Regions:
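Structured segments of extracytoplasmic/periplasmic soluble domains
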Residues: 1-8, 114, 118, 218-222
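Short pre-active-site segment immediately N-terminal to the catalytic Zn-binding motif
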Residues: 85-110
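Catalytic Zn2+-binding segment of zinc metalloproteases
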Residues: 110-127
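Loop/turn elements at helix/coil->beta-strand transitions in domains of secreted/extracellular proteins
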Residues: 10-16, 69-74, 194
Length: 224
């Protein structure tokens, strides 16, 4: 977690407490593979029929477990190597604790949802469509439909010469812009970078400037 900026630079402002919850069985339920596990949290994949979407239905039961320590946010590390997780703003997050090479990336991606509600910047491969009406400005800091883009901090961070929308240029993969495609759809929703930890976890390991600034502002707000 603290290997990734801007969490790394703010490590001293976090308190992390682990609650160990013993279970009758080990692992996570995977309905699509007919794998069923009797565990304390009852975590399972295939939420909304998405293989990688791991969640916990009994939130009150999860809160009972977490209540053994003081907390502001709940994050569950599930005992599995299977890629996946989930995170909901001001609710809780969960991800695989033992994925061979992306455990940390999944953790910080989902925590981006949990801590301040960053939006998913990737396209497709979900069970829901039209989550962002194109005539409504998303409240998430890192997504826009350009309906009311001027009110976002993102707009103020742009170079005045940057075209909006911004064409993807492979020679400048980390140029801040307004790139079409995000919020699960190809058209009508825009993201700040061609790629970011809120987008494709396979090819990058940093947050874009918009996400980083939003995270820092939320940490500052919570630590006043």
């Amino acid at each position: 977690f603290f290997s990734y900026s801007p969490f790394k630079e703010n490590a001293a402002r976090f308190n992390i407490r682990a609650v160990w919850a013993p279970s009758m069985e080990s692992g996570v339920t995977i309905p699509g593979e007919h794998v069923w596990r009797n565990t304390a949290a009852q975590a399972r994949y295939y939420t909304f029929d998405s293989e990688r979407y791991q969640m916990i239905e009994d939130f009150q039961g999860l809160r009972d477990i977490a209540a053994h320590a003081p907390y502001d946010h709940i994050y569950v590390l599930s005992n599995t190597q299977k890629y996946g997780g989930g995170g909901i703003y001001n609710f809780y997050g969960i991800s695989a604790a033992h994925h061979p090479n992306r455990t940390g990336k999944i953790y910080v991606h989902e925590f981006g949802h949990v801590l301040l509600g960053l939006g998913d910047e990737y396209i497709g491969n979900v069970s829901y469509n039209d989550m962002y009406p194109t005539d409504v400005e998303p409240w998430e800091a890192n997504l826009t439909t350009l309906t009311d883009f001027g009110r976002k901090e993102w707009k103020k961070m742009l170079d005045t010469k940057t075209p909006v929308p911004t064409p993807v240029n492979e020679k400048t993969p980390q140029k801040l812009g307004v790139y079409e495609g995000g919020g699960y759809v190809n058209k009508g929703v825009y993201r700040p970078w061609p790629n970011c930890l809120m987008n494709n976890l396979h090819t990058i390991d940093i947050f874009c400037p918009v996400c980083s600034q939003a995270i820092r502002k939320q940490i500052d707000f919570l630590c006043r």
